A protein has these predicted regions:
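Conserved donor NDP-sugar-binding/catalytic core segment of glycosyltransferases
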Residues: 1-24
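Hydrophobic residues in alpha-helical segments
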Residues: 3-4, 40, 123, 152
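Generic short beta-strand
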Residues: 12-14, 50, 148
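Generic alpha-helical hydrophobic packing signal
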Residues: 17, 22-23, 57, 97, ...
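Conserved nucleotide-sugar donor-binding catalytic segment
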Residues: 25-118
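C-terminal subregions of glycosyltransferases and related glycan-biosynthesis enzymes
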Residues: 98-184
Length: 184
């Protein structure tokens, strides 16, 4: 007799409302289940409000990082999804309201600053396999470039210099290995 897979994290679909008007989520925001790590690298693809998490997960992976002013959910899902699959119930059981001033994405500039911290934290985990590590590094390099471009546009020279140095170090370390990260 076969037993169904026991997932420790489950999430549902959601209805999006922006400024009081229902909107369709873009294709990149489509929810999924299974091994969604690579989708999680690109964006926060699980809404904490639509998820059920077995409490043992927090003992193993830690809590949401309250030191991050934003993107603490991105950080948590990365740490979890790097090692476990998730269940997805394709029913819109949540109404997600956006477009208001309380949204963290409107409150903080350069949200990629916090995603970079999450990616760097994930790279510290020795359990991360080589392929996922390389993909994480590629995403980190991409996020650094986004912030560099934004810093140049806003003439934040010291900020740009610091990030460019970090990006160059990553590219030098990982673009010259036997199995190099594709650096663009």
């Amino acid at each position: 007799e076969s037993h169904p897979t026991r997932y420790r994290l489950s999430h549902t679909n959601e209805i999006w409302v922006r400024n009081g008007v229902r909107v369709n989520a873009g294709s990149k925001h489509q929810k999924n289940g299974g091994d969604i790590f690579f989708q999680c690298l690109k964006l926060c693809c699980i809404s904490p409000s639509s998820s059920l998490v077995d409490r043992t997960v927090f003992g193993e992976f830690g809590l949401f990082d309250e030191m991050l002013p934003a993107c603490e959910d991105y950080d948590f899902w990365l740490r979890f999804c790097a090692f476990e699959e998730v269940h997805f119930l394709n029913e819109p059981l949540l109404i997600k309201n956006g477009g208001h001033d309380q949204q963290l994405s409107k409150k903080h500039w350069g949200m990629d600053r916090f995603r970079i911290i999450a990616l760097e934290k994930l790279l510290q985990d020795p359990r991360l396999d080589n392929f996922k590590r390389q993909e994480t590094i590629k995403e980190l390099i991409l996020r650094l470039q986004i912030l560099i471009d934004g810093g140049r546009k806003r003439k934040k020279n010291a900020f740009v210099k610091k990030l460019a140095k970090k990006k160059a170090m990553l590219e030098a370390m990982f673009c010259n290995e036997k199995e190099p990260v594709q650096c663009e």
